[in-house]
Amino acid sequence: MKRVGLITIVAALLLLVACRSQGGQDAVHEGGDTLTVQSQLLTLTRFDNYVVADVNDPWNDGRLLSRYVLVGDSCDSAQLPDGVVVNVPLGSSLVYSSVHAGVINELGCVDAVTAVCDAQYYSMPSIIDRLANGLVVDAGSSMSPDVEKIISHNPAAILCSPFQNAGHGAIERLGIPVIECADYMEASPLGRAEWVKFIGLLYGEYDKADSIYNAVAVAYDSLKNIVAKVPARPTVISEMVTDGVWFMPGGGSYMAEVFADAGADYVWADDNSTGSLQLDFATVYDRAHDADFWLIKTFGRDLTLAQLESDYALHARMAAFAHGGVYSCNTGATSLFEDFPFHPEVLLREYVKIFHGNMLPVYELKYYKPVK
């Protein structure tokens, strides 16, 4: 595309940007119905003619990261609160993450996924086939998307994941609503799963999304409540040394909560961090060498005990290594990352099977395997 043509198209897109309202923000939620319950980062408030979606800043308590005003075909800016106005349902969209594409597919709206980033990480047949047939545009890397392709495609919205102290570069100047999906920063499993309601609103399938969430919440809480009665709770740690650093989930993290809900005592449960702790082997060994279970995620390989020891010889000193307590998930060969964000009940079920196998005698592990 020639430079003059590119500039002309950008200018045209800027003129077509969705209308923004001029109303005040203080009373934005008054008179509306709140649709969210568990999420700490997302508040959905429904009014007669629009829905306000507030995304809290995960890195700054009390600060709003983004506000979206979801409206139907017409938009009367004088009646709307401040925010990025998004016309819904979306008929086209650029989706950065396979996680979000997966739940859009579950809602029956995969035809509205018309462009993706990081196409090589998609495992869904519906997206792979549409990429091959030219029905989905490959917009390149999510870290540096192909702006010219995006301009040419002109999706109705862009769904991406925000990062701390990082903007979206040229994408923000295209006049296309950028939907910041901060669900991955939620600390609770059901809090993250509740973002399906936002996705449902964006694609015109709120009722289906609400039903999906309610079923997930019932399944998760039912199993959690049963497991809460177990007489003994094994100890567990996660991941392994990589380039000299052991990235251990913080005690206030999503994974720590799932471990607890699955009936295990996470060794770093007394830590309040919601992110990953960067530890050396000596620190982990001193505190957790006798942990009963050791869960590891890999990409592109099925781990063996020999490989684990070869990666870092001192791994073999962990008690779980010798006693059959090491389990690994090859995330490149399974759909774990696509499944669990909006279906934490599948991850909970997997961990309950590992920690308390007799409680789920019929269930067979889907993602993890014992490392031998």
Regions found by a protein language model. Name each.
Residues 268-270, 274-359, 363-372:
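C-terminal soluble interaction/assembly domains
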